[in-house]
Amino acid sequence: MKHFGWWFTGVMLIAGLIVSVMALTPMGEKPFRAMFEPGEVTFIDFAEVSMERRPNRFLVCPTFDLCAELNDRTAIFDAEIPQLKARWDELIALEPRMELVLADEEKMQYVYIQRSRLLRLPDVFTVQFYDK
């Protein structure tokens, strides 16, 4: 039985070393991205979205009439949409591992995926710009 304990410990140390190397080096980018795919990414109809389907969803809107349900309210900016969108793009460009995956210019809705630094776990962000 003691022999099994040493063997198991050795296997776990090797597995931990492999995962650590993959997580801390660019070598792990592709395998972790493949393991942690976000699934089907689609546009959201904020007026119809339900919080019941996804417990890890957090919905923020400027007013209740734009969203079916919401967790918090956003600020309302006194700016034209093109200027606001340009500033948004500047801020998004500063975020590490952020990728635009869907864009609907007509609805002004954009879907981004940002991955965590170590395991490349995906977070999906959807933003839509509304005119006053």
Where does each model-flagged region fall?
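Ser/Thr-rich, low-complexity intrinsically disordered terminal regions
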Residues: 4-9, 19-132
